[in-house]
Amino acid sequence: KKPYYFVSLFVFKRMLKGVFFCEVILWLNNQINNEQQTFYMSEKREEFNKDNYSADSIQALEGMEHVRMRPSMYIGDTGTRGLHHLVYEVVDNSIDEALAGHCDNITVIINEDNSITTEDDGRGIPVDMHKKEGVSALEVVMTKIGAGGKFDKDSYKVSGGLHGVGVSCVNALSNHLKATVYRKGEIWEQEYEKGKPMYPVKKVGETDKRGTIVTFLPDPTIFTQTLEYNYDTLASRLRELAYLNKGITIHLVDKRHKKDDGEFEGETFHSKEGLKEFIKFLDGNREPLIKEVIAFEGEKNGVPV
């Protein structure tokens, strides 16, 4: 047994030496990497110190320039998700009108060129002169970050958008946008290119309608991955909004495709029971453990709960 014992001991010692040798190599490698990193950082620090970091280095972007330069800060990204988010922001303004009790119908149209048109029968964005800005309130809403009626507790008790950020961001990120307002028997409009007004808000006619129409075409220099809207993505979102805001009727129309009868593809979303009906929709064909959905609703401080 002794020869085997000495052989085993010999092998064990060699293994220990091997482990020790590997640890030494790893330690030396880490030291070299640390020295290289320290040298690199010192070089960069010297380069930075040589740069003229002064007042001229500070950029003050005007208007919507910051939105166009950093769009992901406002809409999440510039891919498919961000592209569809533009629609959500405009629709949210119509939803706010509905929550305030002034809108019953919302229509979203995917046009043949993949531009989007949204229309509601709300009160219409105000078009009279804004005292502080010196331009029409419509132009303020469309071109100023943080502009909107949702900060005024007398105008909106609840809201679902980005509180004035949304529609101006959509305008900034659009190659072209046209806003048409039906308000107090008159039709007003203004068009924009990349967020900048092409002309002052002007009266273009008379009407017995009311509401706001916004048509926008996303800027291809910003949305470089795709400009094509997905019908199912928009349908899913609008369906959820109809459930979350019972009583509202939301129409989705896709002018890129026609059915056999010649009508455009589309569907209408409307819910009488709201979230209660939404739960049934989510259950689908599955057998529920609780036959009847338990739901409560009321009002607190004038806000539906």
Residue ranges of each PLM-predicted region?
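GHKL-type ATPase core
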Residues: 42-57, 114-137, 148-281
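Bergerat-fold GHKL ATPase/HATPase_c domain
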Residues: 37-91, 139-140
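A conserved short beta-strand within the histidine kinase catalytic ATPase domain
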Residues: 104-109
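Noncatalytic partner-interaction/assembly domains of nucleic-acid and motor enzyme complexes
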Residues: 281-305
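Conserved helix-loop functional segments at active or binding sites
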Residues: 66-69, 73, 96, 100, ...
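Positively charged N-terminal leader segments that act as targeting/secretion signals
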Residues: 1-26, 37-38
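Conserved ATP-binding N-box helix of the HATPase_c
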Residues: 81-103, 166-171
